[in-house]
Amino acid sequence: MALPRRPPTLTRVYLDGPFGIGKTSILNAMPDHTPDGAPILKVYEPMKYWRCQSTDLVVAANETPERRRGGALSRFQSDMIMASIQARFADPYLLFHERLSSKCRGKIEICDTPAIILMLDRHPVAAILCFPITRYLLGEYSLEMLISSIIRLPLESPGCNLTVTILPDEKEHVNRICSRDRPGETADRNMLRTLNAVYASLVDTVKYANLTCPYEKESWEMEWLGLPWFEESLLEEFISRPRPVICSRTRMPLDRTLLAIFKRKELCSENGELLTQYSWILWGLLTKLHTINVELFDISGMSRRECASAIMHTMPERLSTLASWNDLCELEDDVISYNKGMCNEVGASR
């Protein structure tokens, strides 16, 4: 009697982090196949969608706060425009995430020989969480709009690998942004510092969620009460504080996570407890992040090929997802269609 054929596996890796440090270049340097011949599919940043519709979203996102500061827009008008822009940034990620999630059947811990490797330029968490939080901390996005954005974060299917790339050398980061000279893009050092801090805190948040959800809600609520109010005086500390690496088996202190910035009197009762609806939202955020396998990848001093090689070297250690052969064939078509319709990369199917 023949043994049942083992279902194929899919390894998916999201490459994320602050803009301008070379994620797309790393993606382009990835090989088209593994040494065993498995295809490596690449999903690029949806720059065509962002820039080639009726509004250039990159330009609008940077111009709108300037218009408010110049008096051309009220705070309310600016908030509404920024919320709309940020939602449109997120739309392509959410669209592809929904299609991809339907093909992920279950998690296995390690797979040396996946049938397909999928490399994606950013996870939905970038447009829904990291950039809105950065804008909020810079005073360019309201707290209520930030809360509204967080609700949109989708549930994550098993087997998600998130690699957050960082480039601590601020001068090098600025040089890279200036050298690519994209219209409407600015190398604002304050924004870069804030964005880097947010991404570093995202890693801590995911690690906290890994060990807290779904069974430690009461413990989380007790830790929450011990957090200080996130007043303006804590903003600089959040941005500049050192974040030493903590063992993944040790629960991260809550004050190192992104949740700490939500300890605001607008969201809490007098004793510091979250109001019910905001408790649902923030606990929901943790539960959506808790299945993600996250790592911090410092690319300092590395060429794009060295970065790609390092990612490939650790591929056997990443989580994989069971799929079906029909799903994987459809996924390859989805990647080709998405890149063609949404992205500027020519012929970027693999």
Swiss-Prot record:
What EC designation does it have?
2.7.1.21
A Pfam family hit: Herpes_TK
Instruction: Tell me a Gene Ontology molecular-function term this record carries.
Output: thymidine kinase activity
- List keywords of the entry alphabetically: ATP-binding, DNA synthesis, Early protein, Kinase, Nucleotide-binding, Transferase
Q: Does the keyword Transmembrane helix apply?
A: no
Where does the chain bind substrate? 86, 182
Q: Which residues form the active site?
A: 45
**Keyword match Ribosomal protein:** no
Functional description taken from the UniProt entry: Catalyzes the transfer of the gamma-phospho group of ATP to thymidine to generate dTMP in the salvage pathway of pyrimidine synthesis. The dTMP serves as a substrate for DNA polymerase during viral DNA replication. Allows the virus to be reactivated and to grow in non-proliferative cells lacking a high concentration of phosphorylated nucleic acid precursors.
* Quaternary organization: Homodimer.
| Family that this chain belongs to | Belongs to the herpesviridae thymidine kinase family.
Name of the protein in question = Thymidine kinase
Gene expressing this chain: TK
